[in-house]
Amino acid sequence: MRRFFVFLLILAFPLLSEAQETITVMQYNLLQYGNYQSGFAECYETNNNTQHKDDCIRTILNYVKPDIFTVCEFGKTQQLQDDFLRHNLNINGISYWKTDNIINFANSSIINHIFYDSRKMELKKHVALRTSPRDTDVYELYFKTSELIAGDTVKLVCIVSHPKAGQYYETDRLATMRTVMNYVEQHYADENVLVMGDFNMYRASEQGYQLLTRTYSDSRSLFVDPLARVGGVGEWNNNATFAPFHTQSTRSYSDECFSSGGLDDRFDFILMSDEIYMGFNKIKYVDNSYFALGNDGQHFNQSIDQNGNAAVPASVASALFDISDHLPVTMKLHLYSQWGVNDMNLGGFRVYPNPTNGLINVGLPQCDSPTMGQTEYRIMNVMGQTLMTGIVEGESQKIDVSQLSNGLYFIHINGLVSKFVKTTSLH
């Protein structure tokens, strides 16, 4: 079946060329798009007009030019999905944007969605996880690289989640993220995975965020926050320190539908598996490419277009203000498999126990052991900082990592990389 699927892709579509090596991903909460029966927000045709939102979306899409566009708060009807494609993506002679059929187990009035450039990728699978108050959607994509000819595929999994909003619903958000992490462990550990959406989290200390990035029991499934290495992780809510990273709200006043208060929360995320962060599986995060579109760091507790905007043109700032109370987040991924380049291998040596609370054992295969019986190791954190170096003697070595803070780490030896989690206690 897999070979037949690959064969059809090769026949039907051109393969990616070197000019298409970078993939742009954008995640956006569209604020009750096409939904006027939410029961939560006072959003009507008069103050959240779909036609005007489409005008804004086209402006933003033309500026960002994403290849993968995932959204939250999209109305649940098939007609709305078809209209969105026709009015905003497949326009001006373009016909390559695709999406998938709606799955809505929760029967929510707003759902998640994905739109993708079918010249570069195809959707193989769409699964909806039963989370509350709405489903979490899992989209498995395959890129059209030259490796398809050999029957190989480069996979990217996009998990779009929109857990419950509000300061008092941390337990609900934790339950949603536990469902996500359990599914990742069962199906996509050690693969290229993005988890994205409006997470409604006020601080990095929230248990749901910690579960995604640090505390989940299977270290293979943990996610990396691209803002970790630039100081973007912390107590985000109403904290000016994190002004460059906030995504909500785009306006300082409310008209009933849009939240007020200006930019003072980081609710919107794209987190990545370490396979993407480090480039283990032929897709690599482009360093420093992650940002909240339109956030110039100068609009803390202000409207996004107040007194101009240094990050985007005025037309884009105006569109961001008009369409939603959230900013979209975007990142770039480098797809390098079509040239057979892979300068970093995952595994090749054992690290155990994993997780660890103090000592790790590093075991090298005999063929990888240096002639003189010694080779250097480096231990790095998710921010790319080297924290420890030393020598592995022979085919095995004990390394004391008790002084490291709890979290995910990478150990580099002889051009190979493995990962481990440091934790305070083992259960």
Language-model segment annotations:
Residues 344-427:
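C-terminal outer-membrane/trafficking sorting elements
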Residues 13, 65, 327, 352-354:
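Hydrophobic alpha-helix-in-membranes signature
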Residues 1-21, 341, 424-425:
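Bacterial Sec-dependent N-terminal signal peptides
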Residues 3, 321-327, 406-407, 414-415:
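Short glycine/proline-enriched turn or capping motifs at secondary-structure junctions
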Residues 20-337:
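Divalent cation-coordinating acidic motifs and surrounding scaffolds
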Residues 335-346:
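Low-complexity, Pro/Thr/Ser/Gly/Ala-rich linker/spacer regions in secreted
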Residues 4, 22, 48-51, 369-374:
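Intrinsically disordered, low-complexity Ser/Thr/Pro-rich tracts
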